């Protein structure tokens, strides 16, 4: 071990001092790979944390949460629950809940740009009966000081006595801040977004009457009831919908699982491309020290000592690069968290996190990734350096390294691509709560990317078949006819990066093309109306029947229709149940059918079973098909058709409006669509409604279309950043590969210069060699990327989200991508060639 440490101190660290810029560049390369993964991970975790926190209440986690099968619970149900439980020591906490939006927050005109808070009404008497559960400042000792209004967290920034103007459903109301609940260690504190109010007052403000949304149950341990929690749940499940206390938080993670998993996979694919770059950089380090390694071996240093010394140096580089990657990853996460949060807010539920925090475990994970990647990348160069005889490493005519047999066997790449084709045919892994994991699809994508990179050498030799009379061309092509491992890795990195970018571009184009067609089919009304507080997918705002009637009496309105919505728990996952006017939808042909109903008037039934339409996401998530009969909230439902819906991956079931009202005992609307009379200006009507109804958001058809496409583009904003990083890394890798190759050939370059070849011609030869590698990588990458796009569109997307997309490629985008990679690769190669043309025949440390 002393020999290894001596080599590190006298050789490795000396090179670090003499060539500090090169070592810093290596650290940056390592940092880039780990920081991309860490940034995406921190951003998605921060958004998820905000999403989960939005479900938190004011007590410890309840043992059970009880809701009605359909509709709302009533105060009389509390007596039934208490009678069912008998003398068991279980506390009941009735709750009403509504999302609210501050009226002062005007946003920027975009859906989701305004804040979303929660107004929580709880029974203060029941809350105070829970020892240690009441937030500080609401203890029994000062119950008489409890005033009318809302209690808020200090994080909200409001003061006692201050008035808050809030949007609730379609109304703008004013509530007074009754007090600010201080934060005390060991006592539950209010989340920043939560407004707490006494239950009777909240019922009055929200116009709920005697209705409540849910009841939280907290069991108290007792020797008389050793299995109290399980017994309580069993008794309640006989009459009501019962969830475990942790289900709300777990459901938040489940809903966003596919979205977050896709981000993670993309960041890991970018890390794969970075792995090629790390290999080439460390291979260059070994190459620069070949003479030194040869001298050490001649002095009797063992192969094992040399290999261990290089691996330890690589680990040290990985540690330094990883530490830098943690910093870059944290900074990148701050930039990415906004985009990820907006996407989750629009598609899943309210989350307002704008900062990503870094934990010790996440930092250690990033360091581990960097060190592991460095060791893996350094293992092969270190092994070859240790095993190469000294005679092959010393002097001006050291033998060029062409790579081991495994790197020259191209059939391995083709075999991996064949395996990817077979894996793409396997079904998705399904779990009991309806979530899916396309493990075979992700594995197929990985094998296809790596296999395409390894098989790209075939294209490299095809490019080299070009006959040339010029000496510059002949020299450039001669190196490509017998490519070394550095050529192969350079073209593999380019092919993988271009394939990843092409595949994502095809998926985005397919989504865009499909979305536009779906929007044209389903958005035919002139004006769409929702509550101004509906800023996220979890918003519970509704429009009252009175307001709907006023909209129908608006001058210029010819037809009005509305959609009702409720969220239910079905087979362990949340689903959306919709109620629509089927006659209006049939008249205007609003459905984009995946499987059309057998009879046009699908809402009519000959028996007691309710007809319904499911979305494609529902079918993919739960395995329900047209013709199946399911049990939903105590009702028999027959699936008569399936429609395409691209804004909801949880799945939706559509009922006739009469059935919906009977099930849920409500006439409130979720969204309202207005058809205007011919010649009426939609913008004029929109402005008039907004002036008369400040609690509503009103969108013209054109505006809502733009918003839908904006949310779609926002969803893929992080994806585009990862694509750009991958291509940049691959092009830099090409430059590093050529640098190593030309360093290895510096004696040959000196000979060519002595024979009369000018330095400019040497630089041109290097540029043409880089052009050949770039062409092979670009052509292979685009071809492989088209199949990868097919995999993403028809397999991974379908299995993750349940959406069928129409395959669509923007060919001129792909042509621009290929041209950009080729031109950039040639320019990088030319710069390296100009530098190499000035190299002396003997290497000196720089």
Describe the role of every protein-language-model region.
Residues 1-6, 10-26, 234, 258-261, ...:
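Alpha-helical transmembrane segments, especially those used as permease/efflux helices
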Residues 2-272, 284-287, 303, 343, ...:
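Membrane transport/envelope proteins' first extracytoplasmic loop
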Residues 18, 22-24, 34-62, 283, ...:
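Alpha-helical transmembrane segments
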Residues 20-45, 257-291, 315-329, 369-376, ...:
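Hydrophobic alpha-helical transmembrane segments of multi-pass inner-membrane transport and secretion
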Residues 65-72, 458-598, 616, 707, ...:
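Juxtamembrane segments of multi-pass membrane proteins
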Residues 113-157, 537, 545-626:
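Short beta-strand boundary microenvironments
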Residues 279-282, 315-348, 361-387, 414-430, ...:
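Small-residue-rich transmembrane alpha-helices
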């Amino acid at each position: 071990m002393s020999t290894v440490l001596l080599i590190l101190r006298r050789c490795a660290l000396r090179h670090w001092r003499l060539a500090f810029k090169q070592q810093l560049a290596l650290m940056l390369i390592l940092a880039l790979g780990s920081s991309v993964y860490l940034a995406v991970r921190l951003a998605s975790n921060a958004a998820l944390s905000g999403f989960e926190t939005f479900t938190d209440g004011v007590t410890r986690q309840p043992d059970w949460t009880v809701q009605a099968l359909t509709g709302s619970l009533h105060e009389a149900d509390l007596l039934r629950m208490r009678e069912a439980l008998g003398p068991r020591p279980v506390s009941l906490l009735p709750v009403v809940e509504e999302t609210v939006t501050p009226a002062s927050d005007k946003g920027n005109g975009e859906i989701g740009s305004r804040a979303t808070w929660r107004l929580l009404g709880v029974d203060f008497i029941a809350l105070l009966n829970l020892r240690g559960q009441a937030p500080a400042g609401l203890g029994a000792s000062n119950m008489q000081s409890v005033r009318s209004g809302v209690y808020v967290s200090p994080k909200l920034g409001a003061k006692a006595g201050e008035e808050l103007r809030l949007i609730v459903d379609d109304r703008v109301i004013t509530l007074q801040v009754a007090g600010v609940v201080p934060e005390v260690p060991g006592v539950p504190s209010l989340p920043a977004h939560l407004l707490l109010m006494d239950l009777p007052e909240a019922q009055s403000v929200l116009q709920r009457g005697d209705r409540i949304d849910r009841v939280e149950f907290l069991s108290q341990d007792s020797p008389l009831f050793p299995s109290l929690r399980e017994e309580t749940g069993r008794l309640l499940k006989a009459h009501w919908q019962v969830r475990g206390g942790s289900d709300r938080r777990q459901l938040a993670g489940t809903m966003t699982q596919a979205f977050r998993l896709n981000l993670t996979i993309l960041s890991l694919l970018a890390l794969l491309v970075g792995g090629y770059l790390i290999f080439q950089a460390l291979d260059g380090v070994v190459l620069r020290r070949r003479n030194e390694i040869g001298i050490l071996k001649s002095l009797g240093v063992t192969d094992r000592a040399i290999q261990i010394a290089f691996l330890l140096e690589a680990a040290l580089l990985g540690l330094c690069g990883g530490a830098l990657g943690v910093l870059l990853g944290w900074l990148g996460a701050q930039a990415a968290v906004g985009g990820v949060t907006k996407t989750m807010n629009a598609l899943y539920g309210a989350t307002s996190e704008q900062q990503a925090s870094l934990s010790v475990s996440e930092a250690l994970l990033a360091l581990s990734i960097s060190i592991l990647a460095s060791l893996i990348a350094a293992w092969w160069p270190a092994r070859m350096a240790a095993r190469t005889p000294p005679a092959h490493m010393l002097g001006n005519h050291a033998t060029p390294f062409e790579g081991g047999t495994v790197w020259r066997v191209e059939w391995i790449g083709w075999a991996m691509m064949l395996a990817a084709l077979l894996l793409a045919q396997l079904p998705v892994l399904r779990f009991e709560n309806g979530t899916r994991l396309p493990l075979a699809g992700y594995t197929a994508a990985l094998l296809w990317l790596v296999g395409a990179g390894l098989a790209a050498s075939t294209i490299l030799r095809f490019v080299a078949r070009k006959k040339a009379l010029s000496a510059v061309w002949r020299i450039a092509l001669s190196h490509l006819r017998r490519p070394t491992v550095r050529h192969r890795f350079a073209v593999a990195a380019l092919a993988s990066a271009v394939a990843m970018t092409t595949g994502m571009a095809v998926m985005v184009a397919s989504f865009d093309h499909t979305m536009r067609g779906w929007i044209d089919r389903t958005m035919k009304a002139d004006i769409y109306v929702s509550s101004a507080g509906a800023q996220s997918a979890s918003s519970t705002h509704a429009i009252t029947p009175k307001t709907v009637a006023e909209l129908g009496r608006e001058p210029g309105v010819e037809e009005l229709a509305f959609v009702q919505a409720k969220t239910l728990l079905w087979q362990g996952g949340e689903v959306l149940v919709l109620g629509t006017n089927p006659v209006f939808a049939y008249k205007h042909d609003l459905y984009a059918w995946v499987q059309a109903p057998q009879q046009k008037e699908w809402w009519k039934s000959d028996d007691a079973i309710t007809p319904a339409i499911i979305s494609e996401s529902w079918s993919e998530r739960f395995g329900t098909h047209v013709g199946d009969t399911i049990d939903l909230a105590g009702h028999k439902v027959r699936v008569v058709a399936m429609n395409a819906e691209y804004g909801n991956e949880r799945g939706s079931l559509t009922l006739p409006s009469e059935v919906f009202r009977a099930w849920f005992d409500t006439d409130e609307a979720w969204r309202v669509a207005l058809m205007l009379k011919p010649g009426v200006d939609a913008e004029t009507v929109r402005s008039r409604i907004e002036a008369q109804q400040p609690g509503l958001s009103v969108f013209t058809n054109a505006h809502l279309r733009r918003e839908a496409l904006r949310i779609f583009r926002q969803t893929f904003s992080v994806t585009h950043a990862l694509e750009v990083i991958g291509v940049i890394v691959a092009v830099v890798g090409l430059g590093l590969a050529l640098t190593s190759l030309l360093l290895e050939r510096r004696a040959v370059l000196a000979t060519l210069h002595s024979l009369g070849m000018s330095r400019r011609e040497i630089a041109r030869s290097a540029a043409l060699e880089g052009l050949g590698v770039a062409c092979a990588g670009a052509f292979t990458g685009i071809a492989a990327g088209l199949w990868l796009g097919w995999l993403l569109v028809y397999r991974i997307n379908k299995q993750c989200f349940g959406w069928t997309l129409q395959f669509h490629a923007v060919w001129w985008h792909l042509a621009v991508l290929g041209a950009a990679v080729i031109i950039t690769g040639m320019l990088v190669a030319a710069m390296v060639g100009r530098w190499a043309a000035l190299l002396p025949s003997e290497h000196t440390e720089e």
